[in-house]
Amino acid sequence: MKTCVIGEADPFIARLLKRFAAESGLQTVIAPAGQDVVELTRQVKPVVIIMEAELPGTIRGWEAVRALRADREICNIPVIICSWLQEANVDALVGEVAGHLQKPELLYTDFEAALRKAGVEI
């Protein structure tokens, strides 16, 4: 089964994203902090990473994206940002994300569309 790393500190949103991933046929691993996203991605080699832009931790959200992009073994795994930021702001901050999910209105149809945009087959 394909795996998805979900980087989200809010337990409610993490559960919602986990449910969306399961409906899309993806197994999930939850990472509550930025450094956990990087470590778990190195371990499980997911097909996609969905993470909060402002994820807490010793490596925060945007720093985690940069760390993922700097690692040759995992740099090609698409990252979808889940954030309160507007999509234009996300694109301006980090041009290397594959998609964006807008909080607080997280809908399954948007989740599916973000996966397709990221090139993830479901």
Predicted segments with their positions:
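His-Asp phosphorelay/catalytic-motif detector in bacterial-type signaling
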Residues: 45-47, 73-78
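Receiver (REC) domain switch-region micro-motif
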Residues: 4, 49, 68
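Acidic, metal-coordinating helix/loop segments flanking the phosphotransfer/catalytic sites
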Residues: 30-48, 56
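Non-catalytic signal-transmission and effector/linker regions of two-component phosphorelay proteins
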Residues: 1-11, 106-122
